[in-house]
């Protein structure tokens, strides 16, 4: 059960959904789901030194150079999407998916981002990351999760963080 006190762990969107569900009257049906944590996202990036490669690419980036920004963003997104999940994270996601799908092979799901810095008073990160609907099966869920993680490094998001003075490492996805 997620609540607004979980924003740092699961981001604003997931915490808000959890809060809303907890406040609904009995009998109101809401689709169930699960969330990975910001810690899991950071573990994914740390696995096999990916975060160091990302930081090295971002450290020398001039976000005013549109071509360089596009190249760096594409390169980082490709690295993230190619990164394997740590075994324990993949196992946890697979188990949560199995519970959620309850053996329904035809079930489809939404894979959505929830950033730890989405709804701040002086910055709005909402809408910068990807959402995927009608995702079918664990393999596609895992693939779309990587695409969601990679979307933290789309050109718009990279530039926005730089211009708002946020360190890239300070924003995580759930």
Q: Which role fits each region the language model picked out?
A:
Residues 1-174:
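N-terminal beta-alpha lobe that positions the nucleotide/phosphoryl donor
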């Amino acid at each position: 059960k997620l609540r607004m006190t979980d924003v740092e762990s699961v981001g604003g969107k997931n915490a808000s959904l959890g809060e809303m569900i907890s406040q609904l009257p009995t009998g109101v049906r809401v689709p169930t789901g699960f969330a990975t944590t910001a810690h899991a996202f950071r573990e994914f990036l740390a696995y096999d030194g990916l975060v160091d490669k990302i930081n090295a690419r971002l450290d020398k980036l001039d976000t005013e150079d549109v071509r360089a920004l596009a190249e760096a963003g594409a390169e980082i997104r490709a690295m993230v999407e190619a990164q394997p999940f740590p075994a324990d994270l993949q196992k946890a996601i697979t188990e949560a998916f199995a519970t959620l799908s309850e053996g329904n092979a035809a079930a489809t799901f939404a894979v959505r981002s929830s950033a730890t810095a989405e709804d701040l008073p002086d910055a709005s990160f909402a809408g910068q990351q990807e959402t995927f609907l009608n995702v079918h099966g664990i393999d596609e869920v895992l693939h779309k999760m990587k695409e969601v993680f990679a979307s933290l490094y789309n050109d718009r998001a990279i530039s926005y963080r730089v211009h708002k003075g946020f360190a890239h490492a300070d924003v995580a996805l759930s």
